């Protein structure tokens, strides 16, 4: 199926690895011109080279920390014509509530929420003029099922849903859509590294870890396995396409059924 993304300019924040990289790769595979982002130039260069090698597609890069307003301004000056904005950049860290200082709440909000808000604010005027655009926030199942071990993270993921829905309301009646995507447990590089550490200390295989994880930690999962980054990316690519023109203001789950709700 042709998603109609040929030559559309897409920016994916936090896209040198994991879900973000998979999204950038999927969009490039559909013919979009993709701008990859990471904190360091070597990471960005490596991601660009991998996308070009895999997809035979052109890709560009922007290195910088998008939790900073100054970096968002630099990005906009370098790439002012973005038509598809995917706000994937974010941070997480398990920490007990009593140990989360005020500065940490602010840091998480800056990184996970304001980074996307700033970019949407910068790119929205041109999208309005063109009467076409896509803004997608990569949230999490943690937006709905707040994890007790990282309440500050869950708060930011819920805030993304509010921003996404409110912005969709603000552009009602235009050719711009705004949606959020809620991945569930996903087999990212971080998961791989964690399992490798377990294998060294507990002689536990990935399969054994996965089985135990979904029995004890995410028993409501319907697929009983980690999703792949590519499975999340497929949903994002569709939402970014002209084919998804009737989908806006939605919180779309790619959580493997972890959230135990029909709505």
Regions inferred by a protein language model and the residue ranges of each:
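Substrate-binding pocket helix/loop in short-chain dehydrogenase/reductase
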Residues: 96-97, 104-109, 135, 217
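Alpha-helical segment proximal to the catalytic Tyr-Lys
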Residues: 125, 169-170, 245
